[in-house]
């Protein structure tokens, strides 16, 4: 009986797990986000003059949808965006564009639709303000977070 319950639970988890990740196309400077609920781009250093961006959906949508956020184009109206700065202690609602400072490290967080979806990835900007993935740090953090999760 114990094995039947374990098998049923594994089957349920395999069928209910959805793809919640997000990707950055460095060439196009576009984020592709699967099943978005909340998305944020914030500087790693809280004393930096860079802005933090929090993205929320204005209207509910189907779960199986991919949202796109262009870093070099105008922000679409389907997102409610809050731009804030810890350096100047001010915020703006619905800015037109995303302004990333050159030579700055960023943390991008995705809270997806589903239970306990909270993904963090690390990026940096080059001297021209283009965002790039910090692959060595992302791999290190992902392996450690898996180990921590398995040890609980």
Question: Over which residues does each language-model region extend?
Answer:
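Extended, polar beta-sheet/loop recognition surfaces of beta-rich domains
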Residues: 18-21, 30-32, 36-38, 113-152
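Signal that preferentially marks extracellular ectodomain short beta-strand elements
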Residues: 70-105
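N-terminal export/targeting and maturation segments
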Residues: 16-76
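Sec-dependent bacterial lipoprotein signal peptides
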Residues: 1-17
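Ser/Thr/Pro/Gly-rich, low-complexity intrinsically disordered stalk/linker tracts of secreted
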Residues: 61-63, 102, 119, 139-140
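Conserved structural position at the C-terminal beta-strand
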Residues: 108-112
């Amino acid at each position: 009986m114990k094995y039947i319950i374990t098998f049923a639970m594994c089957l349920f988890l395999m069928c209910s797990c959805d793809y919640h990740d997000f990707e950055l196309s460095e060439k196009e400077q576009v984020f592709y986000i699967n099943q978005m609920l909340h998305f944020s781009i914030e500087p790693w250093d809280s004393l930096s003059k860079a802005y933090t961006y929090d993205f929320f959906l204005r209207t509910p949508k189907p779960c199986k949808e991919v949202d796109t956020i262009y870093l070099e184009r105008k922000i679409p109206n389907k997102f409610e965006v809050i731009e804030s700065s810890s350096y100047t202690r001010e915020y703006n609602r619905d800015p037109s564009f995303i302004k990333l400072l050159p030579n700055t490290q960023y943390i991008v967080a995705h809270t997806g639709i589903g239970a306990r979806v909270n993904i963090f990835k690390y990026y940096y900007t080059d001297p021209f303000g283009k965002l790039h993935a910090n692959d060595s740090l992302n791999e290190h953090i992902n392996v450690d977070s898996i180990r921590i999760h398995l040890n609980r």
